[in-house]
Amino acid sequence: MEELPIACTLGAADMADRRDAWEALLRDAALERERLPHGARVRLRDAPGIAERARALIAAEGACCAFLAFDLGADDGALRLDVTGPDDARPIIDGLLTL
């Protein structure tokens, strides 16, 4: 399998807006965060609108950061968001999820 380059295609202004959207989601819904071997996991409150906001951000990230993989699921009454990528992407994942 070919490894994708670790590069984001967003410009500076769009990157700031995206960062703000992630920070707002995490501020509104994050219950706990943990590191995974190749990424991180965030448990989110399963409240109205949270899954939709997370899905929208996942879709947007997929368009600009193809080297990251996202998995959103349910786990013990909460949402579980896993973000994984190559080892060199760890600082990006940590920054995205403010670990």
What do these predicted regions represent?
Residues M1-E52, D71-L99:
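Secretory/periplasmic and organellar redox-cofactor proteins
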Residues R55-G73:
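Amphipathic, hydrophobic secondary-structure cores in small proteins
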